[in-house]
A protein has these predicted regions:
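N-terminal amphipathic/hydrophobic targeting modules at extreme N-termini
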Residues: 1-9
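DUTPase catalytic domain/fold
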Residues: 21-198
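Short, Lys/Arg-enriched N-terminal segments with co-localized hydrophobic residues
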Residues: 11-24
Length: 198
């Protein structure tokens, strides 16, 4: 009889030692990212090749932010809640002409990348913050860092200020980086956030 463990880890058996199994994922290097961009497999618009790092691509902050307003009573967090209910409790602000959005201590807002990224069906991605900003208490994604294969979107950022400082968020800042990973098989995202917007 094949155990559940064997069924799950069977294809990783070559990477198992004394019962400990490693699940290997392939992260694209900067050179491979550049190659796939030139071949049109990954599409980033608008794009500057100077934003390619050792194993990631820097993405910049757009000029729209969604901030939350006061609401009386609890807001339900459940599977039955609408995926876009957050829009009922928030408003959009646009920052023009180099003006920043000010994020106070302990506050959260939604931002969006200037760039739209299109992934092929065999690649997924992660969005990570940058260390220089994290050291000031800035988190650019609270939990939702995974980008599905086949996505064709700007990336919405759940931005949180964990510091005691007021942070000035300037549109155009390289605020996060995207890491690309190959996956076994192919898939295509067709979920509710396929057309991302604040």
């Amino acid at each position: 009889m094949i155990s559940n463990r064997d069924h799950f880890f069977g294809k990783f058996s070559d990477h198992c030692i004394n019962g400990f199994c490693l699940i290997i994922m392939c992260i694209l290097s900067g050179a491979e990212i550049r190659k796939q961009l030139k071949e049109g497999k990954i599409i980033v618009e608008p794009f500057d090749y100077a934003n390619i790092g050792i194993a990631s691509v820097d993405l910049t902050l757009g000029d729209e932010f969604r901030y939350f307003v006061h609401h009386n009573g609890p807001v339900p967090i459940s599977d039955e809640a609408g995926a876009k209910d957050y829009q009922k409790f928030s408003r959009i602000m646009k920052c023009d002409d180099g003006h920043p959005y000010y994020l106070g201590p302990g506050q959260m807002c939604l931002g969006i990348t200037k760039e739209k990224v299109k992934l092929p069906s065999n690649l997924c991605a992660l969005v990570e913050g940058r260390s220089r900003f994290a050291r000031l208490g800035l988190s650019v994604h609270i939990t939702a860092s995974f980008i599905n294969p086949g996505s064709d979107n700007q990336t919405v950022l759940e931005i949180f200020n964990a510091s005691s400082l007021t942070l000035a968020l300037y549109p155009g800042t390289k605020v996060c980086q995207m890491i690309f990973m190959t996956m076994e098989g192919e898939a295509h995202y067709n979920g509710i956030f396929q057309d991302q917007a604040l």
